[in-house]
Amino acid sequence: MASSTSGIFFQGDDESQSFINSHLTSSYGNSSNSAPGCGGPTGGYHNLSMVSGDMHNPVMMSVSTPGPSAGASSLVTDANSGLSGGGPHLQRSASINNESYMRLPASPMSFSSNNISISGSSVVDGSTVVQRHDPSVQLGGSSATSLPTSQTNQIPLSMARRASESFFQDPNNLTQARKKPRLDSKQDDALQQQILRQWLQRQDILQQQQQQQQQGQNPQFQILLQQQKLRQQQQYLQSLPPLQRVQLQQQQQVQQQQQLQQQHQQQQQQLQQQGMQMQLTGGPRPYENSVCARRLMQYLYHQRQRPSESSIVYWRKFVTEYFSPRAKKRWCLSHYDNVGHSALGVSPQAATDEWQCDLCGSKSGRGFEATFDVLPRLNEIKFASGVLDELLYLGVPSERRYGSGIMVLEYGKAVQESVYEHIRVVREGHLRIIFSQELKILSWEFCTRRHEELLPRRLVAPQVNQLLQVAEKCQSTIDQSGSDGIHQQDLQANSNMVMAAGRQLAKSLESHSLNDLGFSKRYVRCLQISEVVSSMKDMIDFCRDQKVGPIEALKSYPYRMKAGKPQMQEMEQLAAARGLPPDRNSLNKLMALRNSGINIPMNNMSGQGSLPGSAQAAAFALTNYQSMLMKQNHLNSDLNNTTIQQEPSRNRSASPSYQGTSPLLPGFVHSPSISGVSSHLSPQRQMPSSSYNGSTQQYHQQPPSCSSGNQTLEQQMIHQIWQQMANSNGGSGQQQQSLSGQNMMNCNTNMGRNRTDYVPAAAETPSTSNRFRGIKGLDQSQNLEGIISNTSLNFGNNGVFSNEVDESMGGYSWKS
């Protein structure tokens, strides 16, 4: 071994040692006196390295350019392994001591051409080399010492040249150099691990540099380079011991996982930035994935691949799959100039006046609409009334996506073709479909410009030929007999033949039972029924809320709507000023309270003091309260002077909370069910207030027992309705009521709930008018339920009541 500043020599037999020593002594003289302050050959051969890539061609190279020394930072693993390059590229680490020596492993590591190439760069850093301090190393009888680092560059370069020339020119030296030198040293596992770590680090650095340099190069070259690197890594792993191989593979896996995590984080950041930009802009933008167009293709495919006998069950599943529960399907016929309202006959004049197409902006009133509940029955009727297939020819799509997730698919030109057995109906227009985030249809709008009815030639040709033959026969008869010689019988026969041929032609044209719009009569009838029922929904709600029959509702509903329209507008304005949604049901409840004579403070209304509960509970309590007031009015007018003795047994069977008080209503006695109801009440509710007891004992001298709290209850009802409107907007408020307010509320609620539990006393025989008035409210509610059930049975075949009507849908938004 040589010192850290000397060249690299190999210790062989005596001849090779004497050969090297002779050249060293001839070039520099005495090793101790060859240079001032210099230790002999270690100072001059700092740029000398031996390369033995092949044993048959040993070469000693000398680099002519001065540079840093290649000492302990250079690695020679075997006499057969080569280091190409020289001094300018091999840099010495400053951390290596001048007297440090490098120990080489006993088992060499071979780097083939396919494995790794070391050219012009140091493989092992000097800081990681295990140093061994040895005062001197004997090399062929001449001592070799090390020079200080500051004096290594003072050796003249000509000496190295002469030494190399003398070495190559001597033929004896070549034969001696063919002998294989050997290096004997001990195994050092720590050094191998350090070498592996440094090699991996250098490989990562080189890989990053190459990737940065090759970003703009050919991708095929990059693929080939990656494949070559993989092969080199595999070969290198195979050459390693099993333990080191496992460790290296684990390190590579950890690095790959870290890279994947970094890429995933970068992708998430990009998506978040895009989402923030979409939320900031909020406007439509092109959506290149065409996901809505593909969804429409799926819709058409499943519609065409329907079962041969498609029932209502299949169409309900179909509509549920592709349509949102709040979906609507609209057809606009505003561009039909020769078609009036009578052609469709769907909506009343009030409804058609409010019709407006969102695509063309027309307010002609010609068009119709179907909601989610009607679509299953509508599809069944359409394909059961003669439609064999329905085709849709689409132009260039325009697909947009908004920041809220709503996607709009629009076709400026769309052709819909309905295929019947003997006719084809072709409609051309503008189609726009709005999809939700779940890719379900929210709105289907088709603005039709015109339509054509196409008949096959084979259907019309026989009748036309027959008519032509009859006309030719008539003409021949006239030619033969003249205009004056035609007999009356022949003229009548020819006329009958012409009429028969004309009727046959007209029959072939009108056998499909289509109207002027190209729709089947049964299809239009279903639309009519659904539209009528939808328009009557408000009146049905009015019947249910007011507990009146249909005939009385028909009499009073138009006047109520006409008189209540300004009040409804006032309610809507007040709700908008309070920041509440325009809930029709809640506004109708408030209108009912106001029409019944209850004073609603419109200016000082606040959400505080409202009772918790759902909108259904508020509507139920309000309905019970109204029914109770109506029933009390009838009973007060008819039974004010009637006295009924109460049975002691019934008094004893009553609830303890009501003992010692007079009956709630004259002419009626307690039912045993009162005790059952009161037993389920809370203790707080079972405590009657003093005002309640005082009022019930003096019924004949003053209004009913709970009349003193009617005003408080009215205010509570109003507050409750306002609070339910606020809760539907996302807010909630629960305020505690006072004890007197709760007792008053319980009093009225119990009266309303248990009004059917009171039975007339046996001593009283009510007259016809009393019986009618006493059970008027119950009869009206029963009649209303019967009428609604009969209506559903009558319209059941047409599929109007196939699904439950969702009150939250709000009906048609284009209606007033």
Curated annotation (Swiss-Prot):
The listed locations are: Nucleus
Please name the Pfam families in this protein's record.
LIM_bind
Q: Which UniProt keywords apply?
A: Developmental protein, Differentiation, Flowering, Nucleus, Transcription, Transcription regulation
**What if the gene is knocked out?**
No visible phenotype under normal growth conditions, but the double mutants seu and slk2 show severe embryonic and seedling defects characterized by a loss of all structures derived from the shoot apical meristem (SAM). Enhanced tolerance to salt and osmotic stress conditions.
Its cellular-component GO annotations read:
nucleus
Q: Where is this region: Disordered?
A: 133-153, 166-189, 644-711
| Superkingdom of origin | Eukaryota
Q: In which tissues is it expressed?
A: Expressed in young flower meristems, ovules and the carpel margin meristem.
**What is the documented function of this protein?**
Probable transcription regulator that functions in the development of the carpel margin meristem similarly to SEUSS (SEU). In association with SEU, supports organ development from meristematic regions by facilitating auxin response and thus organ initiation, and by sustaining meristematic potential through the maintenance of PHABULOSA expression. DNA-binding adapter subunit of the SEU-SLK2 transcriptional corepressor of abiotic stress (e.g. salt and osmotic stress) response genes.
Name the chain's protein. Probable transcriptional regulator SLK2
Q: Which organism is it from?
A: Arabidopsis thaliana
Q: Which gene encodes it?
A: SLK2
